[in-house]
Amino acid sequence: MQNAEAAPALLAAHGLVGRRGGRRPLDLNLRPGQLVHVRGANGSGKTSLLRTLAGLLRPRRGEVRWNGADIHADLPGYYLHMAYLGHDNGCSDALTARENLRYALHVAGAPRAEPELERALRDWGLAAGADAPAARLSQGQGRRLALARVMLSRKRLWLLDEPDAGLDAASLQRLHGMLDAHLAGGGAAVLASHRGGGAWAGCTQTLELDEYAHAEVVGADCLA
C-alpha cells in the first residue's frame, strides 16, 4: 500500500457546518490506511458528524466528497463503498445471528463465503447462539454481531459511532484487530468514542469536537 499521506483522499469534508451553525467550519481529509478518532462530550455533535459523513444528514453549509465527488450526487453509489454503524446495531431481530451475517455476505457479493461467516461467528463469540433469533442476544452480543457484519461487508470506508459500547475486554481487543486489518488492507475509518486517542492503534488523526462543527485536528499520529 502506498504511503497514506501521499495517497489522494478517499473521504473529504470541506467547509462543513452543522445545522445548528455558529461554529468554525470543519475540513477533513481521510486517506487509505487512516483512521480519524472523533472525541467530544455528550451533545458535542459526534453522532451528527458521523451521520453527515454517512449522507444521512445534510450539512447547513459545506460538502462531503467520496473520491472527489459530492456524496449526495450519487448516494446509492457511495453506499456501495461505505458501512455505517450507529447507536442502533442495524441487525434484523427476526433473523438469527448466522442469517444476519449471511445477508451481509450476500450484499457484499460473496454469498458462498460460509467459511468466512463461521470464522466471524467464532471470533466474535457468537457461535453458540448463532441459530437463535438476534432479538435474544444481549446488548454486548448484539454489538458484536453488528461489528461482525461491518467486517464482512467488504466496504472500504467504515463510519463507526461508539463501536466499543457494551464490549468486554476480549471483544474490545477483537475490535482493535479488526480495525488494524482493515487499515492495513487500504481501508479507512472514522470512529467516534469517548476513549483516549492512544486507545486506537492505527489512529492517525484525533478530532476534538466542542460543538459541531467546531472541530480541531490534534496530533498528526496517535499510534498506540
Curated annotation (Swiss-Prot):
Which residues are listed as membrane-spanning?
none
Q: Which reaction does it catalyse?
A: heme b(in) + ATP + H2O = heme b(out) + ADP + phosphate + H(+)
Q: Which InterPro entries match?
A: AAA+_ATPase, ABC_transporter-like_ATP-bd, ABC_transptr_haem_export_CcmA, P-loop_NTPase
User: What is its membrane topology?
Assistant: Peripheral membrane protein
Keyword Membrane on entry: yes
Known role: Part of the ABC transporter complex CcmAB involved in the biogenesis of c-type cytochromes; once thought to export heme, this seems not to be the case, but its exact role is uncertain. Responsible for energy coupling to the transport system.
Identify the NCBIfam families for this entry.
ccmA
- Protein name as it appears in the record: Cytochrome c biogenesis ATP-binding export protein CcmA
Gene, per the UniProt record: ccmA
